[in-house]
Amino acid sequence: MKPGGLLLAAIAMSAAYAAAAGAQTPSTNLPVVWVLSTGGTISGRGASPTALAEYKSGSMLGAELVAGVPEITQFADVKVEQIVNVGSPDITLDNWLTIARRINRIFAEDPKVAGVVITHGTSTLEETAYFLNLTVRDERPVVLVGAQRPATAISADGPLNLLNAIRTAAAPEARGKGVMIVMNDEINAAREVTKTNTYRLETFRAPELGFLGYVDADRVSFYRSSTKRHTSRSEFDVSSITALPKVDIVYSYVESNPAMIQALVASGDRGIVFAATGAGTLSSFEKQALQPVLAMPQATRPVLVRSSRTGNGRVIAREDYDAMGLIPADTLSPQKARILLMLALTRTRDPNEIKRIFTEY
């Protein structure tokens, strides 16, 4: 088939699935939920039902995913949009800005929308979720969902995950809970959740703070809320931002190479997050490498944040690091500390203001 024919076939297939999804909607009295599809394993196809590791992600469009779970129409009037189509390792900061703006526009244009679901690959799902937790300006729920097995696999987890995500987005109890991840019948908060296993279905965990709730056969149940600022209480506005400040992560290990710090500064990084050992401890090699950075004028030197590579626990303020200007990341993982620092730098370079932001978010 010629390339033009392939494109026409893809368009026709998308239209057919969209029509099928619309035809299944039994009532306009159901909550309206938007599904924004971005690709990932949940939309992947393998060569056989046992192909659990070798498959092509993003092979199914969002309309096809929704049409494949007709039970969805019992719970919501679903509108589907394919906003991007990439594997989550290839998601970009521009994609994040596009998704955040689209969600904010959906909420602003239609007060009847109950919530938004985003289908997403699991590799970077927690990062996208936390970015949206800081940039969606509405109390209505945003739920990210993925799968550990492709759609063609035996016992694929994607269909039930998608159904449960839509049920959560449609639930009145989900308002004000911030951005969430729903997988394996469990509801997690974007700030605390992380992927903990490469293949197991129960991969998403908030190891110390626990689930927000569960999605069971009878109802969506919540047992706690995140008290940190998010969504409708967030100060971050990306409506007119064209690019996010450059921030990178330096991973600490025995005799780590200090040249990495120098290279990031030379490349123009506006911030550096340390995935430090233990309770956010830098080695003497790293401290030495930071001396030229600390000698730079405050207006031009990168903002420095201490997080921990351990995966659990707080990184707290210490006099020696405070004197060096390193800001503690509290319980944020290195990758989430990077996201918060990028957004903080869109507003200020004042160290005290950035400390406040890391305390409140």
Model-derived regions: residue spans:
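Bacterial N-terminal signal peptides that target proteins for export
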Residues: 1-8
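Boundary at the C-terminal end of the N-terminal hydrophobic targeting segment
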Residues: 18-23
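ATP/NTP phosphate-donor binding region
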Residues: 24-106, 288, 312
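Internal gly/pro-rich beta-alpha loop/helix module
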Residues: 144-217
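C-terminal non-catalytic interaction/assembly regions of soluble proteins
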Residues: 279-361
